[in-house]
Amino acid sequence: MTLRFEASCPDGLCPGWSVILKGETPPEASKFEINFLCDRDDRVAFHFNPRFTESDIICNSYMANRWGQEERCNHFPLGVEEPFQIEIYSDNDHFHVYIDKAKVMQYKHRVEDLKTITKLQVVNDVKISSLEITKKLFY
């Protein structure tokens, strides 16, 4: 696992926060991950994992020392060495995922206390050109 970015947000990243990652993948890319981590117990509230070798996006949560049921999105709009923008934002019920401004999926929260989601991590085969974490206004 190669760490590309990590940030702590002690007040919590959910709900109402938006993460916008701009980047591209290197020619040898097989996968990368965006993880929303909890402040205790090594829990992963949301694991977003595009896999280029499978042309699939795997999402999951790691709770109570085990991975939950995978959710797959077989719409795969990412290409190796092609620039992209991924936005992930959270409301009270879901993480919403947009790639190049088109919604590709939503993932129901599996963590009850959303304020415990305090860390963002990006790992593996991705070259980050910018990453922005902002409060999103809901209308």
Curated annotation (Swiss-Prot):
It holds the Pfam family Gal-bind_lectin. GO terms for molecular function: carbohydrate binding; lactose binding. SMART domains: Gal-bind_lectin, GLECT. Keywords: Lectin. The keyword Ubl conjugation does not apply. Residues 5-134 form the Galectin domain. Localized to the lens of early embryos (48 hpf), particularly in lens fiber cells (at protein level). In the adult, expression is highest in the eye but is also present in oocytes, brain and intestine. One of its GO terms (biological process) is camera-type eye development. The keyword ATP-binding does not apply. The galectin domain, in contrast to the one in mammalian ortholog, is a functional carbohydrate-binding galectin. Binds lactose. Homodimer. This is Grifin. The gene is grifin.
